[in-house]
């Protein structure tokens, strides 16, 4: 892709993730990719370009670039363009035309990928977390259904998690923390919507929700587990073999059988046991790759897809042919 709009200078945090941090998505007919100020692109399954739509050319006060990934809903491609124009946009999947736009200055520094789930009344709702607020939008037309104030300010990087009509939010800097709140309602939701609030937090990675536990490795090299039902801390443990300085982890954890995996930037992939007790099971490195491993891995049919800044790897158990 040849850039058509000027990007932020390649300096600071941009050198750690670049201009193509978003994960592409597909509906089986087209592949959609987001490249920040160069907009959203659609190609067919043979790689032929179909359309390109600009979503703005602004920069936040941090000038960190974009990170959120695209999501699909019905015939729409939804993009968090908080960096480019302080807005959430829905594009028509076939043409790239803007169907709706939800704007707000508070969206600046909202880096997480939105999520669509069912509200308490059974209606689809698009959940967007921003510094100081969380929104529930109608994904068909972008209209605001509900919103609530929260204590996570500064910048919010992790994406929200949802299960059983409960939304979990993480992030913030310097006022960081986490919360769980009940889905549902209309208009402004009060404090009674929140089930719990905690100072435990993840700065960049989106935690893994498994049964009644939330697991993550933070950007200081500490493994966390808190109880999803009440926010109680179950363990907080520094991980042996993981560098403790320089933000050693950006990737989010993924579930792999009876354990969870998370790549570190420089010290390999760590496997930890699920459950309320800390147990480091393995640390695996790719010794001839000295570049950063910043992205979240994907698992497909027993194979682990792992990307560094220079190489894409497909790994499988040596017991499988």
Stretches with model-predicted labels:
Residues 1-321:
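Noncatalytic, solvent-exposed loop/strand surfaces
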